[in-house]
């Protein structure tokens, strides 16, 4: 069986930066305890479990402000997905020490929204409802940001927006093809709209790699957490653009033998928040797959927790929000 290891795949710089920030926080004895992460630092349960073993508590839920109310004292880390100004204000009001691990690409979108609001614009934001990144972006200026996820949402936007200065931007981890189609629909409805595509480069090149390399495979395995939007989009790109069957799995335990049976070429990629050892475990199993002598798929991943987080040789001081 041939294996195509899609390149690039796995960790992006924003994820690595966020994990290093949280790891440094766990090693900084001057920070008040407990240390909480407001949501999943990145969307991967293996990573959040590893931080739990490091003494950092992950609090997750659909709304950052509601989660924040569970915290009375200590330190709070904002995740790579970004948070609204209201969350930051409330955390300071509660007397919490705040550390910001927002991805720079997400922060760029927040800056764009702030700037356009100051210039009198309304913003149409393409994103996945219920995902923390749109929650934070909409929260930058909730009075002028309109969240849309699909064509039906666009149809429901008021015609009165034609009388407003208008831009469209997007969640950084969306499918670039979905965003393109939705932006075209918006340009048709609002001909004067300014287009600001904000798909991050890491997401873009990983999607393009799948589009270009997956057609050579019989099936694509995407290793990524179910909450990881960029992982789910990789599977979508494989099916819709590369026309290759695709399955997303969290780790080796979710791999199915029937996906491998009768196949000659298997491609493997990974979401931007998937630990490299978790991906390697999947690749190693597929490499060793023998239809005449099948090794049972493990019920759980065998990757030790201490192999998940980045190694910190010299802990750096943690930058605390003013």
Curated annotation (Swiss-Prot):
This protein's record includes keyword 4Fe-4S: yes
Stored InterPro entries: LytB/IspH
Active site (UniProt): 133
Pfam family, one: LYTB
Residues holding [4Fe-4S] cluster: 12, 103, 200
List of residues binding dimethylallyl diphosphate: 43, 81, 131, 228, 230, 273
Reaction it catalyzes: isopentenyl diphosphate + 2 oxidized [2Fe-2S]-[ferredoxin] + H2O = (2E)-4-hydroxy-3-methylbut-2-enyl diphosphate + 2 reduced [2Fe-2S]-[ferredoxin] + 2 H(+); dimethylallyl diphosphate + 2 oxidized [2Fe-2S]-[ferredoxin] + H2O = (2E)-4-hydroxy-3-methylbut-2-enyl diphosphate + 2 reduced [2Fe-2S]-[ferredoxin] + 2 H(+)
Binding site for (2E)-4-hydroxy-3-methylbut-2-enyl diphosphate: 43, 81, 131, 172, 228, 230, 273
CDD domains: lytB_ispH
Record pathway: Isoprenoid biosynthesis; dimethylallyl diphosphate biosynthesis; dimethylallyl diphosphate from (2E)-4-hydroxy-3-methylbutenyl diphosphate: step 1/1; Isoprenoid biosynthesis; isopentenyl diphosphate biosynthesis via DXP pathway; isopentenyl diphosphate from 1-deoxy-D-xylulose 5-phosphate: step 6/6
UniProt remark on cofactor binding: Binds 1 [4Fe-4S] cluster per subunit.
Alphabetized UniProt keyword annotations: 4Fe-4S, Iron, Iron-sulfur, Isoprene biosynthesis, Metal-binding, Oxidoreductase
Enzyme class: oxidoreductase
GO molecular function, one term: metal ion binding
EC number: 1.17.7.4
Residues that coordinate or bind isopentenyl diphosphate: 43, 81, 131, 228, 230, 273
Cofactors that this protein relies on: [4Fe-4S] cluster
Gene Ontology biological process terms in this record: dimethylallyl diphosphate biosynthetic process; isopentenyl diphosphate biosynthetic process, methylerythritol 4-phosphate pathway; terpenoid biosynthetic process
NCBIfam families linked: ispH_lytB (TIGR00216), PRK01045.1-1 (NF002187)
Family: Belongs to the IspH family.
Function recorded in the entry: Catalyzes the conversion of 1-hydroxy-2-methyl-2-(E)-butenyl 4-diphosphate (HMBPP) into a mixture of isopentenyl diphosphate (IPP) and dimethylallyl diphosphate (DMAPP). Acts in the terminal step of the DOXP/MEP pathway for isoprenoid precursor biosynthesis.
PANTHER family per the UniProt record, alphabetical: 4-HYDROXY-3-METHYLBUT-2-ENYL DIPHOSPHATE REDUCTASE
The protein, known as: 4-hydroxy-3-methylbut-2-enyl diphosphate reductase
Species per Swiss-Prot/TrEMBL record: Macrococcus caseolyticus (strain JCSC5402) (Macrococcoides caseolyticum)
Gene responsible for this protein: ispH
């Amino acid at each position: 069986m041939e294996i195509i290891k899609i390149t690039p795949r796995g960790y992006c710089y924003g994820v690595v930066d966020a994990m290093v920030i949280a790891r440094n926080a766990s090693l900084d004895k001057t920070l008040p305890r407990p240390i909480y992460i407001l949501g999943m630092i990145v969307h991967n349960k293996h990573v959040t479990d590893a931080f739990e073993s490091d003494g950092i508590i992950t609090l997750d839920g659909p709304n950052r402000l509601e989660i924040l109310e569970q915290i009375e004292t200590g330190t709070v880390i904002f995740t790579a997905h970004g948070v609204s100004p209201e969350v930051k204000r409330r955390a300071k009001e509660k007397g919490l020490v705040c550390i910001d691990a927002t991805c720079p690409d997400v922060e760029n979108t927040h800056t764009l929204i702030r700037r356009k609001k100051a210039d009198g614009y309304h913003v149409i934001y393409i994103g996945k409802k219920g995902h923390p990144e749109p929650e934070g972006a909409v929260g930058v200026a909730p009075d002028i940001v309109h969240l849309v996820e699909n064509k039906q949402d666009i149809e429901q936007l008021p015609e009165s927006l034609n009388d407003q200065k208008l831009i469209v931007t997007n969640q950084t981890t969306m499918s670039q093809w979905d965003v393109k189609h939705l932006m075209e629909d918006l340009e048709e409805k609002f001909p004067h709209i300014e287009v600001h595509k904000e798909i991050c480069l890491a997401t873009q090149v990983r999607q393009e790699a799948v589009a270009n390399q997956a057609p050579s495979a019989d099936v694509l395995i995407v290793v990524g957490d179910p909450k990881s939007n960029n992982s789910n989009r990789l599977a979508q790109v494989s099916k819709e653009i590369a026309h290759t069957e695709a399955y997303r799995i969290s780790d080796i335990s979710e791999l199915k033998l029937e996906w491998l049976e009768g196949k000659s070429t298997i491609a493997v990629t990974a979401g931007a928040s998937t630990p490299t050892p978790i991906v390697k475990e999947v690749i190693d199993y597929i490499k060793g797959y023998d239809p005449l002598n099948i090794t049972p798929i493990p019920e759980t991943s065998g990757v030790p927790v201490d192999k998940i987080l980045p190694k910190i040789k010299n802990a750096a001081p943690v930058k605390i929000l003013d």
